């Protein structure tokens, strides 16, 4: 579905067009703020390798963790890449695009609040900036480096912590975004962390999305 035609999202799913549009808009906002700034995007965020992609061993095994009742997430922690970030609810704009966290708060992670709560049955979606208008790393700059099995912890408003394990990390061209694969679920509590990534051009912004797939493994 074309971004301009998407106006709403069901509670348990997120429009891929919306997320991709949000990334394009974020990159465009950087250009509006900075004009032509050759130094900002000389490098690019880390890209996941083929070893981090899905394989037979990447699918969940072992006991199933009982889903939690809904509760808002308040903090995201990924010790492996030094992330310890507050979370805020984000929604869709009038065009159906997922609103990223405020541009002035690159250390803030956003949770799609009209979707699944992290730890509940279904696929929860969190997003964050990969970088800032001045080229500094954002909260999700290093998502592309996460290895399988890496722990992701989300502290919730009910004082429980949903603990997830990374199953795979993949980079998708935004023109070939596999929405069913990304937003679909296995029936277990799952998590997706999504940010902009891939190549970057001053005309179109980032050309892809880095997606982290994770499954609930424990509750503390």
Regions found by a protein language model. Name each.
Residues 26-147, 155-160, 168-220:
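Solvent-exposed, non-transmembrane regions of membrane-associated and secreted proteins
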